[in-house]
Amino acid sequence: MDMNTLLSLSWHLMVPEFIILGAAILLSICDLFFKLNHRYVALGAIAAVVLAIVSLITLYSEPAGDILNGSFVLDGFSKGFKTLLLGGAALILCTAMSDDKKNPIEDKGEYYYLFLMALLGAMFMASSVDFVTLFVGLELLSLSSYILVGIRKKNRASNEAAMKYVINGGIGTAITLFGMSYLYGITGSTNIVDMQKVFAGELASGIQLLLALAFLLLLVGLSFKIATVPFHMWAPDVYEGAATPVTAFLGTISKMAGFLLIIRLFLMVFASVSVQGDMQSLYGRMSIYIAVLASITMIIGNVVALKQYNVKRLFAYSGIAHAGYLLVPLVALSPFTMDSMWFYMLAYMLMNIGAFAIIHGLILQSNKENITIFTGLYKRSPFTAIVMTIFILSLAGIPGTAGFIGKINIFLGALHVEPAHYVLASIMMGTTVISFVYYFRILQQMFFRTGEVEEKIRLPLNIKIVMSFCAISIVILGIVPMIGYNFFYEYFPLMKDFFFLGNVVQ
């Protein structure tokens, strides 16, 4: 490829990725040679993410396009979910500026540029429509996350968590690759758009059997990534052992990236495969397995959370349950699937990052991770208690919060399709009621229990900014949800260019 051809490519589609990559390289070099104060590295990382958000906003009006021989696309889907990834990353980086003095991260500079590399991997996963770039993004996210979990090298729990994460992550990646290999063997291509063209024709029954096997392998492999039951056993230990901002990253950015990969692969590949003698697609036939996975994930996640008293383990099981909720719209495919998933991920990101920001601040004060860190919080810091209450009510799905809007839309979406998924909707409603018990236990600690220590709690300014922004956003989206939905419909036309990507970018 000559220089003129190289320069003629649509590199502007990758400007947000270039900004994150450049910042990670620049910060690593500066930290290596100049030994910068970690606060300057943190501010540099935050500035890079904000700049990437601005550059992405300038691309909102850009029509769907592709680069790198069609393996990287910028469509409504990638724009919408990259906005969430970058916004969540900025909030987590702001939270991470407050350090744990009693249990510090030794290599604080590495912490920030590894975070940026993990974010870059997640962004690549949002835009990739080729197995090669998908896998590069997945591994960039995974390898950086493994190191982030174990970056507190002198902490035994952190080392144990990193080891468990590496082993389980490696197993999940191997199974995912095995499933991808079947698709490559059947189609002779690693490009998802090319696969759609192959599957548009008639397929022999033996090929359909191999495709069903590939579906199951990919479902199992990616279930490790999003921590659904029974592939969730790593999550509680990893959440507990990692530094709190890393836990927030795993519970939001990493989980969202896993769902993006599931959506790309399953809805673009398997939904295009017709089953012989049936009007249903292969995805429609196999979605029963996703329904079973969603059901047991919602049940086990919420029931086991009832017995958790370590606050990070409690939120780990809460996250497992929410992964089950997010699988429901993938079973009950409807015109509302994409917007309900986007809004739910937005609400989930805000309430989780906000809650983890407060948890991080309380752990810094008490050096404990038990649920008793919330004891008497209303007397010690009324504002913090009220803000945490907003997050808890939103996680529980109480009306007036963004969490309620997200859950009710998924619930109604399950009933809107034909045939309606009454069992799945009933399980979702029942497990939501169960979640009230462990969520309201935190409220009980804050308002109705008296702690041994009565001194006032003063959280760092950066944590106050993060939790205030998240709380205000949750209330606004809960009262006027059309603000979020109108933004989604105006800038991210997913139904236009997601399912018909080959026609749009060519």
Curated annotation (Swiss-Prot):
It is a multi-pass membrane protein. Keywords: Cell membrane, Membrane, NAD, Quinone, Translocase, Transmembrane, Transmembrane helix, Transport. The keyword Acyltransferase does not apply. InterPro entries: NADH-Q_OxRdtase_suN/2 (IPR010096), ND/Mrp_TM (IPR001750). Its main location: membrane. Pfam families: Proton_antipo_M. One of its GO terms (biological process) is ATP synthesis coupled electron transport. It is found in: Cell membrane. It is an enzyme of class 7 (translocase). The keyword Transmembrane applies. Its EC number is 7.1.1.-. One of its GO terms (cellular component) is plasma membrane. The chain crosses the membrane at residues 14-34, 40-60, 72-92, 109-129, 131-151, 166-186, 209-229, 256-276, 286-306, 314-334, 343-363, 385-405, 420-440, 465-485. One of its GO terms (molecular function) is NADH:ubiquinone reductase (non-electrogenic) activity. It catalyses: a quinone + NADH + 5 H(+)(in) = a quinol + NAD(+) + 4 H(+)(out). NDH-1 is composed of 14 different subunits. Subunits NuoA, H, J, K, L, M, N constitute the membrane sector of the complex. Belongs to the complex I subunit 2 family. NDH-1 shuttles electrons from NADH, via FMN and iron-sulfur (Fe-S) centers, to quinones in the respiratory chain. The immediate electron acceptor for the enzyme in this species is believed to be a menaquinone. Couples the redox reaction to proton translocation (for every two electrons transferred, four hydrogen ions are translocated across the cytoplasmic membrane), and thus conserves the redox energy in a proton gradient. NCBIfam families: NDH_I_N, PRK05777.2-1, PRK05777.2-4. This is NADH-quinone oxidoreductase subunit N. It comes from Bacillus anthracis.
